Swiss-Prot record:
NCBIfam families: FadB, PRK11730.1. Heterotetramer of two alpha chains (FadB) and two beta chains (FadA). This is Fatty acid oxidation complex subunit alpha. It comes from Salmonella schwarzengrund (strain CVM19633). It comes from the Bacteria. The active site is at H450 (for 3-hydroxyacyl-coa dehydrogenase activity). InterPro entries: 3-OHacyl-CoA_DH_CS, 3-OHacyl-CoA_DH_NAD-bd, 3HC_DH_C, 6-PGluconate_DH-like_C_sf, ClpP/crotonase-like_dom_sf, Enoyl-CoA_hyd/isom_CS, Enoyl-CoA_hydra/iso, FA_oxidation_alpha_subunit. Involved in the aerobic and anaerobic degradation of long-chain fatty acids via beta-oxidation cycle. Catalyzes the formation of 3-oxoacyl-CoA from enoyl-CoA via L-3-hydroxyacyl-CoA. It can also use D-3-hydroxyacyl-CoA and cis-3-enoyl-CoA as substrate.
Length: 729
């Protein structure tokens, strides 16, 4: 053994070839600060081996290196800029030493090589991969850019266009694509990976392969003519501006850095990468996006822990076909759980099957599946008008009309047709589970399972624990949602649960703005362009359905009369009374017509202004800041109340439910991350300016306490130790 660290070791393999093996104590290898330091120490040993002829890098895990240790990021990002820059210089000196070894080097890559893992293998001369490879640089999705030389080496290896596509989008690609663009030199089966790697190294050692020529382009300026450079970077910047926008600075920074570094050799180019990375790491956007990644891991880990002793349902059923029922049935079947879809008439069943078939055909058109797979999936969806087969069902979700009487009748009838241990769930969006459970003989086997529309796209499923729901019931439904590829978040029961409970105060803020003379078009523009929502409130209401919102508004008002009971007729009432239900009937705040692809396209409709004038004061202008404050304060206050009341268990789960269920702008990180970023005291000062608008604007006492003591909602993060103690020598 030449060297043994905590996460890697170095040993002789054969005939002058050494192997450096990543072998962390846990289930995966991460390129954390300790591993970078250990790699430097291993290279120091290697550099003294006079009989060294070649080096093989490999992993003892199912994946090569999954990336940097993102749990370190928040503390690293708090380190002063100069110290973070010094540490990056040290880390890059390690990878440069790997690249500068006087012998050929090869990385044998199995499974994932992402982020720092990808940057590590870019420093070797050759790369062999297994067919299950996923390789790429996802840093821009975390609000940063490659910092271990990825923005320097990848363009010089692949050419500007291919590298820009991967880096700016934060993409990872598979083995076939990686081989095609030259990111790997060969693809071999797992069992032949090491033999293949040694064979390539031997060819390089004997001179049959010119490893020096392979290495040289990575050390030099990017080979691009002025015209090629202008085209590549202009197109890349245009695409990034269109897709990322101003709220996500990392992709544009990465493109501009690669452009600026193109005329330099490795050392100067790495300095430019460093100068761009460090300021990005200190942005609120980076902290928010890293926070989302960590929260996602926390939520998924919690679901995994909850279901560790539970068998995933093998047969499911959906009550109520149509678009929602068909979407749920498709998702279950697509992910491998056969499903019975029951309705009371053929028309609805046909609609549900048509929806499932449409979604499968889209997969076929995109080349994701073939005809055989399509037929196999659709054959596991069984439409029926009766309860045949329900005695074999493990879990049933009811997705009928949002009417408590109808839901209770359907659930009570179904309970008599299934086994005693079968779990029943309701896809209600607002009706308390306690109320629906009152119709059942086995309320302990019942809970809520709130999908979001469209089911195949929206990652969140709210799992609602009723007062009598058993732990096993919740675990079974969480297991099914996870199997469907969804992110289940368990919440406690109340009208609207979590997501809709916090959404309707936001809509109430919108209604009050319109009542006071705001133009809905400006409100939408500000909330989309300035705050960053994917849709403004008027457009969102049109998509949800004005009739749906009108009904849900009444349910929420009955549930929380002190805050959500209106004392005036609002825009939603006016549109509802005029039968303007939104996209579903072509008229809402906007008029809708189908575009060439059959999708609804919104157009101005002057008639709506006359309609809204009857429920609004004369038009007046509001500043962007005032619009954002009046829209967001009711939502933030309600989110905080939900945490204080135990409706949602943690800030992390609340923020992920908002991002995955409502499209809360990821660069803000969620409501609690947004609160922590600006500080509770600053938020309180802002909110108090609007408390005259009513109870929805009154800040909860718990938040006032946070403001008084300057306490964040997320646990405080300490800056990483000074760079000198990060094992940098």
């Amino acid at each position: 053994m030449l060297y043994k660290g905590d996460t890697l070791y170095l040993d002789w393999l054969e005939d002058g070839i050494a192997e450096l093996v990543f072998d962390a104590p846990g289930s995966v290898n991460k390129l954390d600060t300790a591993t970078v330091a250990s790699l430097g120490q291993a290279l120091e040993v290697l550099e003294k081996q006079h009989d060294l002829k070649g080096l093989l890098l490999r992993s003892n895990k199912a994946a090569f290196i999954v990336g940097a240790d993102i749990t370190e990021f928040l503390s690293l990002f708090l380190v002063p800029e100069e110290q973070l820059s010094q540490w990056l210089h040290f880390a890059n000196s390690v990878f440069n030493r790997l690249e500068d070894l006087p012998v050929p080097t090869l990385a044998a890559v199995n499974g994932y090589a992402l982020g720092g893992g990808c940057e590590c293998v870019l420093a070797t001369d050759y790369r062999l991969a297994t067919p299950d490879l996923r390789i790429g640089l996802p840093e821009t999705k975390l609000g940063i850019m490659p910092g271990f030389g990825g923005s320097v080496r990848m363009p010089r290896m692949l050419g500007a266009d291919s590298a820009l596509e991967i880096i700016a989008a934060g993409k990872d690609i598979g083995a076939e694509q990686a081989l095609k663009i030259g990111l790997v030199d060969g693809v071999v089966k797992q069992e032949k990976l090491i033999d293949g790697a040694i064979a390539v190294l031997r060819q390089a050692i004997t001179g049959d392969l010119d490893w020096r020529a392979k290495r040289q382009p990575k050390l030099e300026p990017l080979k691009l003519s002025k015209i090629e450079a202008a085209m590549s970077f202009t197109i890349a910047k245009g695409m990034v501006a269109q897709t990322a926008g101003k709220h996500y600075p990392a992709p544009m920074t990465a493109v501009k850095t690669i452009e600026a570094a193109a005329r330099f050799g490795r050392e100067e180019a790495l300095n430019l990468e460093n100068k761009s990375f460090v300021p990005l790491a200190h942005t609120n956007e980076a902290r928010a996006l890293v926070g989302i990644f960590l929260n996602d891991q926390y939520v998924k880990g919690k679901a995994k822990k909850l279901t560790k002793d539970i068998e995933t349902p093998k047969q499911a059923a959906v009550l109520g076909a149509g678009i929602m029922g068909g979407g749920i049935a498709y998702q279950s079947a697509w992910k491998g759980v056969p499903v019975i879809m029951k309705d009371i008439n053929d028309k609805s069943l046909n609609l549900g099957m048509t929806e499932a078939a449409k979604l499968l055909n889209k997969q076929l058109e995109r080349g994701k599946i073939d005809g055989l797979k399509l037929a196999g999936v659709i054959s596991t969806i069984h439409p029926t008008l009766d309860y045949a087969g329900f005695d074999r069902v493990d879990v049933v979700v009811e997705a009928v009309v949002e009417n408590p009487k109808v839901k209770k009748a359907v659930l009570a009838e179904t309970e008599q047709k299934v086994r005693p241990e079968t779990v029943l769930a309701s896809n209600t969006s607002t009706i308390p589970i306690r109320e629906l459970a009152s119709a059942l003989e086995r309320p302990e086997n019942f809970c809520g399972m709130h999908f979001f529309n469209p089911v195949h796209r929206m990652p969140l499923v709210e799992i609602i624990r009723g007062e009598k729901s058993s732990d096993e019931t919740i675990a079974k439904v969480v297991a099914w949602a996870s199997k469907m590829g969804k992110t289940p978040i368990v919440v406690n029961d109340c009208p609207g649960f979590f997501v809709n409970r916090v959404l309707f105060p936001y809509f109430a803020g919108f209604s009050q703005l319109l009542r006071d003379g705001a133009d809905f078009r400006k409100v939408d523009k500000v909330m989309e362009k300035q705050f960053g929502w994917p849709m403004g409130p008027a457009y969102l209401l049109d998509v949800v359905g004005i009739d749906t919102a009108h009904h849900a508004q009444a349910v929420m008002a009955a549930g929380f009369p002190q805050r959500m009971q209106k004392e005036y007729r609002d825009a939603i009432d006016a549109l509802f009374d005029a039968s303007r239900f939104g996209q579903k009937n072509g008229l809402g705040f906007w008029r809708y017509k189908e575009d060439s692809k059959g999708k609804p396209k919104k157009e101005e409709d002057a008639a709506v202004d006359d309609l809204l004038a009857s429920v609004s004061q004369p038009k007046r202008d509001f500043s962007d800041d005032e619009i954002i404050a009046r829209m967001m304060i009711p939502m933030i206050n309600e989110v905080v109340r939900c945490l204080e009341e135990g409706i949602i268990a943690s800030p992390a789960e609340a923020d992920m439910a908002l991002v995955y269920g409502l499209g809360f702008p990821p660069f803000h990180g969620g409501a609690f991350r947004w609160l922590d970023t600006q500080g509770s005291a600053k938020y309180l000062d802002m909110a108090q300016q609007y408390q005259h608008l009513g109870p929805l604007y009154e800040v909860p006492e718990g938040l006032r306490n946070k403001a008084r003591h300057n306490e964040p909602y997320y646990p405080p993060v300490e800056p990483a130790r000074p760079v000198g103690s990060l094992k940098t020598a």
